Amino acid sequence: MLDFMDYIQLAFAEATNWNCDNSYSSLTATAQSLLDFSTPERLRVHLSSLATPHFATSYTLGTVGLIDGSVSYLYSTVPLNNTPSRSALIPLRKLARGYRQVQPPVAPVEDCGWQSCLGGLGSSESKPSGNDDSQPSPGRKATLLNATLHLPPPTILNALFLRRMSPTMQLSLAVCSTRGAPLSNSAPQASLLGQLSHDTGKYSNEYLFSTDNSLFGWRGLWNFGPDPRHPKENSSPQLSLLSAGAEAYYSPVSSLIGMSTGLRFSTLPAATEMPSSSSSASSTTTTSNHDTPISTFPYTLTLVLTPLTGSLSTTYSLRASPNLAFSSRFGFNVYSWESEMVAGCELWRKRRKPSPPPVDDDGLEWARRKMRMADTPAFAPVEPPTTHNRDEENESVLKIRVDQSWNVRLLWEGRVKELLVSAGVGLGPSSFSSPSRAANSTPAGGGQSVGGGISGRSYWHGVGVSISYSS
């Protein structure tokens, strides 16, 4: 489940119309959400709040074996007025990332008033002097500041500076500083990661630099098909999307070189929708006889190749129903002949709370309803159906992941009252070992076994619960 600050950062990206999925780093995001999810390892409590549309805070406390915590603050020049912040109102599918439907590429807004749009203003008119200063000026560009302090020692400080330079460019600066030992006189270790992103909808480029070993990097993604910046009139909706990308890294200090390339093919929402009856004459001649969608379910295929290490990875993810999704991954190394196979699924469940009976029901309510029906006219207007409040729905998701060594992860995420709860467990093949061997295993909270269970380790990879509350 996403942290509250990560959720606010996604809300900032949506408010500024920045497409986080149009990036090479998100090429395998769907498979990673279904296969590489992490389970809580102990008890953690999160308390968060969006105090104002511009300011958010978050506090975390972890216990069982080791007590630690963190304090996080976030400031945004863009007002997040339409962002649900209460844990009882936040859509669970935005926090528990599962199958991610790829959307068609969208061209950035290139009008001259994009600063005012990002600043939350509808016009460039000057505000009266008596108004509050909650809305930024039209010339101010969208900016986000976030800082997190992890305690106890060794103290770690993480800071993030995010700024929209133009409709197609975004600058990100991330700092990580670690305090040394108490008796050490050396300066705290710190590293800076800068990233400049350029997204046009048709393609995207990312330029990276890290002070750690003076690492330079580049990532790029190209979407095949029509250019969203030059739309054609009366064009049919795009049914699928093929994307190709690559990344390269180089460090002149350590002479480190890294590169990879990948492909992604995914169906778009138009492929699973029913053809409309008001389509053009040319389209009706081909689709009028078949009133069925092009694809019965959304799916995503990816292929990633790392030439230097000889690694090849393929993934296949599909959403069989709105509440059920599957994913699988196969990896192979041409140099060592080692392979990896992982499969996983997620199942969403929704349960509505039964409506309580009327308080003043004395057993004669049926007679009163009969009398009201007799007094109403024959053609009385039909009342619209009552919509269920979000609080009347309990939604939860169960994720399962297993690899070729029978290492299993189970994760349940849901809402209990006004709390967001995540509970998970990791199991391995060492569970079939003898009790004496399990007694001589690593201490409680020990590390995760690798590659099918090492002799002498407990089969419990990690058991934990995470509880979150936000206001």
From Swiss-Prot:
Gly residues: compositionally biased ranges: 444-455
Region (Disordered): 429-455
A Pfam family annotated for this UniProt entry: MDM10
Gene Ontology CC, one term: ERMES complex
Record localization: Mitochondrion outer membrane
Coiled coil, from the record: none
Principal cellular location given in the protein's record: mitochondrion
Keywords (A to Z) from UniProt: Membrane, Mitochondrion, Mitochondrion outer membrane, Transmembrane, Transmembrane beta strand
Membrane topology qualifier: Multi-pass membrane protein
Signal peptide coordinates: none
GO biological process: establishment of mitochondrion localization; mitochondrial genome maintenance; mitochondrial outer membrane translocase complex assembly; mitochondrion-endoplasmic reticulum membrane tethering; phospholipid transport; protein insertion into mitochondrial outer membrane
Subunit structure and binding partners: Component of the ER-mitochondria encounter structure (ERMES) or MDM complex, composed of mmm1, mdm10, mdm12 and mdm34. Associates with the mitochondrial outer membrane sorting assembly machinery SAM(core) complex.
Family as reported in the entry's similarity comment: Belongs to the MDM10 family.
Free-text function comment from the UniProt entry: Component of the ERMES/MDM complex, which serves as a molecular tether to connect the endoplasmic reticulum and mitochondria. Components of this complex are involved in the control of mitochondrial shape and protein biogenesis and may function in phospholipid exchange. mdm10 is involved in the late assembly steps of the general translocase of the mitochondrial outer membrane (TOM complex). Functions in the tom40-specific route of the assembly of outer membrane beta-barrel proteins, including the association of tom40 with the receptor tom22 and small TOM proteins.
Domain note: Lacks alpha-helical transmembrane segments, suggesting that it resides in the membrane via beta-sheet conformations similar to those predicted for other outer membrane proteins and porin.
Name this protein carries in UniProt: Mitochondrial distribution and morphology protein 10
